[in-house]
Amino acid sequence: VIFLGGVSNDPMAEFSPSENFIQNAACPAYLSYESKRAGVRRFIYASSCSVYGYTVDELYDEKSPTTCSYPYGISKLQGENGVMHLADDKFSVIALRQGTVCGHSDRMRFDLVVNTMFKNAMTHGEITVNNPSIWRPIFHIQDACSAFIRSIQAPDNISGVFNVASDNYTLGQIGDIVGAE
């Protein structure tokens, strides 16, 4: 089972904190519990690198402290906790802490930093970068698909939390790259 559902960003989480908690924390915990009860061998949870909060000075790995104080990141961490405690030798649980996804799709999301910059460059001829020194893990949609496929194909005894991103950039670097395109 791959859980891709839930509230997808900070503004939506802040708009409806209770719905955010239900969709990002309670639902994956319940679905993973029912999956295990039904004999499913693996549960994959689409988490987020937002669990680390925002940083100017550091890059994070899976052992880094989770310091998010925003409802979205908190709910994704609660979702991880809700699914990970079910892992055992008969039920593998993988949580993928995804970077900010970017890339072309049939249903473009223009609330994502790279996609927003491209849209603004194309429609307004300019890119605005606030806080250019903030680091963001960026995750191309093709790399995201590969991460989920590899999670499906992983040996049965693999469980854990994994950061997945294509690369790390500052918002200023992203603006420069988009501007050069």
Q: Where in the sequence are the language-model features?
A:
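A conserved pocket-lining segment of Rossmann-fold NAD(P)-dependent short-chain dehydrogenase/reductase
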Residues: 13, 93-107, 116-139, 163
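NAD(P)H-binding glycine-rich loop region in Rossmannoid oxidoreductase-like domains
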Residues: 1-23
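Conserved Rossmann-fold NAD(P)-dependent oxidoreductase catalytic core, especially the SDR/UDP-sugar
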Residues: 3, 29-71
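Active-site Tyr-X1-5-Lys
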Residues: 54, 67-97, 122-123
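The catalytic Tyr-centered alpha-helix of NAD(P)H-dependent dehydrogenases
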Residues: 57, 68-75, 98, 106, ...
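Conserved catalytic-core motifs of eukaryotic protein kinase domains, centered on the activation segment
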Residues: 11-19, 54-58, 106-107
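Glycine-rich NAD(P)-binding loop of the Rossmann-fold in SDR/ketoreductase-type enzymes
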Residues: 15, 19-30, 66, 70, ...
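C-terminal substrate-binding subdomain of Rossmann-fold SDR/epimerase-dehydratase oxidoreductases
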Residues: 124-125, 129-181
